[in-house]
Amino acid sequence: NRMGDKPDPDAVLSMTVCDPAMGSGAFLVEATRQLSDKLLEAWAAYPDKDPCKKLGADDRVFVAMRMVAQRCIYGVDRTPAAVDLAKMSMWLLTISKDHPFTFMDHSMKHGDALVGMSKEQIRKFHWDLSKGGSILPELRTLDREVEEAVQARLMLRNLDADRTLELEVTLAEADRKMMKAKQAGDLLVYIWFSQDRPKARNETRDRYTDKFTEALQPGSIERKEINEIRFAPKPLAPFHWDLEFPEVFACGGFTAFVGNPPFAGKNNVSKGNIRNYLDYLTSLVTPEASGRADLVGHFFYKAYGLIKPTGSLSLIATKTVRQGDTRESSLSLIVKKGGVIYDAKRRVAWPGKAAVVISVISITKLSLISLDIITSLIV
């Protein structure tokens, strides 16, 4: 328990937990329950920081859950219907019938957790930071815009869910600050996927530096195609983590990742996604990965890169995550970067009727145990 035996309420509410493929939000619902229990304990230990002293026990529970949901819980999914379902799950959990269904809009978002550009890639308008040239004039104010968005989104965390109009206005302002940068990131991803070879991608990118502003106009062909393909059967739905949740990365990253990311072998990844998707994963998400690695391995590697130096992740995977190409392309790479596998359940029967054997792997950036133990866990 990194918060200590008696964390104060501020410590509990400073935690950020994310599911990168949240589906219906089941893992985030459970995370909300557990963190709200911790928050109630913290209020009991620090009564001077308890905002609900006059409320009954049941009301205190629901206030705690709403505060945790609004401040600590984040989720992403590339299926729009799943995002709506997850929001509904949180809405029902917190008994927020008096609040709009959109009270989690700021932290539960549509997009592909594996596809997107960092702030630095967008600033240089290049996926390869070693090749990016001078910053485009249109992106020179990016740092200021991100900082302004951070401040607006921090206000969201502290606004009561009852203040519906103020929440909507503040979120709209934060989104407006990020709009140009997000559109630049979307365009960069669009350029990358539009070509099959590195040389053609670089040449196309160079052409767009001369017509950058034109390509971002609402009526441009590029904007139209980017918006259409975002919701296609095989979508390209970029998610630029630095820009979507800037307040999280202003604090170094997420406290934790949880979830059950999708499993898919090489052939299914290629068949089930837009052209060049597998190439993107092995070029930009996990550059040292084998093209034969299971999709779940890329989620492990991506999540590890998004947690703070004291953060951790615990994800469900198939047994392939500890075997062959998938292990070498995820767990082994994470360990080489200093990650510590502090718990590994190697063979767990999936509850219910499905004949599936899963692994549950928990990793932290903190140095807790020896490499000998790590090796024994992943073999």
Model-predicted regions and their roles:
Residues M65-V68:
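Short, flexible turn/loop "capping" segments at secondary-structure junctions
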Residues N1-V61, A82, E222-R223, N227, ...:
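Class I S-adenosyl-L-methionine
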Residues Y74-V76:
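Conserved SAM-binding motif I beta-strand of class I
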